[in-house]
Amino acid sequence: MPVRASIEPLTWENAFFGVNSAIVRITSEAPLLTPDALAPWSRVQAKIAASNTGELDALQQLGFSLVEGEVDLALPVNNVSDSGAVVAQETDIPALRQLASAAFAQSRFRAPWYAPDASGRFYAQWIENAVRGTFDHQCLILRAASGDIRGYVSLRELNATDARIGLLAGRGAGAELMQTALNWAYARGKTTLRVATQMGNTAALKRYIQSGANVESTAYWLYR
């Protein structure tokens, strides 16, 4: 099947990664997607519903490769017990950057599509931005008795009813971090907490489902 899509430059990513990339937005009103239209870009991304096999086949015929599967989940917000988390401060940024860089080294920004250090740098910047309140609105952390950070979660208000987890990581701290996220959303009057993760991250999927989340959608990321 032919694919109709607009092509939009990924301005922030291009500046951050030093690449010339764009994303296709599939819509019936857009022109036909052709190799000539894709040629000016060194990297083109596409995100499609996993159930849409027609688009998947058509994009692969245009030279796109499957990079990653994504699962989006949602859970109802309830008032749960306090986890003891605190708001991260700017003095926590160096440690958080190091932790996020290591935890998220194998995202869709990995080699060979991007530089070997690109994924780590991207998520280090993400968690720093969360501490500063840009993009994600806040970062909360759990501390060990030593004072070291043993877990962190970044969160963002989407609208009057929904909040979304950005990054969540901490070995053995998943349940506490979910408590933290639910408390944060509850305090802001939200009714739904959303989170996305890689299809292959079964540990995260189990944690979210154990915390009450249901799968809302699945998608594939493809690159050319």
Swiss-Prot record:
Catalyzes the acetylation of dTDP-fucosamine (dTDP-4-amino-4,6-dideoxy-D-galactose) to dTDP-Fuc4NAc, which is utilized in the biosynthesis of the enterobacterial common antigen (ECA). Residues 94-224 form the N-acetyltransferase domain. Its EC number is 2.3.1.210. One of its GO terms (molecular function) is N-acetyltransferase activity. Acetyl-CoA binds at residues 168-174, 201, 207. Homodimer. It catalyses: dTDP-4-amino-4,6-dideoxy-alpha-D-galactose + acetyl-CoA = dTDP-4-acetamido-4,6-dideoxy-alpha-D-galactose + CoA + H(+). Pathway: Bacterial outer membrane biogenesis; enterobacterial common antigen biosynthesis. HAMAP family: WecD_RffC. It comes from the Bacteria. The gene is wecD. Keywords: Acyltransferase, Transferase. Belongs to the WecD family. The active site is at residue 208. GO terms for biological process: enterobacterial common antigen biosynthetic process. This is dTDP-fucosamine acetyltransferase.
